[in-house]
Amino acid sequence: MAVGDTLVAGMSGRLVGLNPDNGIVRWEAPLASPRGTNDVERLVELVAPVSRVGSTVCARAFQVAVGCVDASRGAVEWVQKAGGSHGIHGNDDTVFGTESNGAVVAWRRTDGARLWSTDRLQHRKLTAPLVLGRAVVIGDDAGLIHLLSREDGAPLNRLQTDGSGVAATPVAAADTLVVVTGNGNIYGYRPD
């Protein structure tokens, strides 16, 4: 993604700022370091989606951490341990993520402080979150769409699909929430 005159990309657990004219690295901002006893255990990658507000880009390092970088300077603003395998989403104030155990977590965008965490969806295979209005929207492996409050993670609503499991992160298209299931069905939900 472009931030000012810099192309920002993920590379082995780091966000990297590149000069788009010649590909020279301007800065590197580590979100995670390799660890483990073999090459597979030491593999560290960033996963999509990422969350950008202004020049701040927040990303998840697979099963290791979530963090934010000021892409105008290449400076790491914060990094917090997090055990998720899907990307994150956020708004001006908060970054949201799902953990591998089914917990949903909200971090303050400015400093990474944990604002809330809920285990109401524990032991479900969750998608990455989508911030939509006052809700955080998350799909699961039973084909349910969960709408949680952005403020405290309290349940707001639950929508049912065909029961085959949500195949990808829900997306917003104009005024419609779009969900794709494992059976290939596409659902569109609009507020009344």
Regions found by a protein language model. Name each.
Residues M1-D5, E28-V53, E77-D92, R114-L132, ...:
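Extracytoplasmic beta-rich repeat domains
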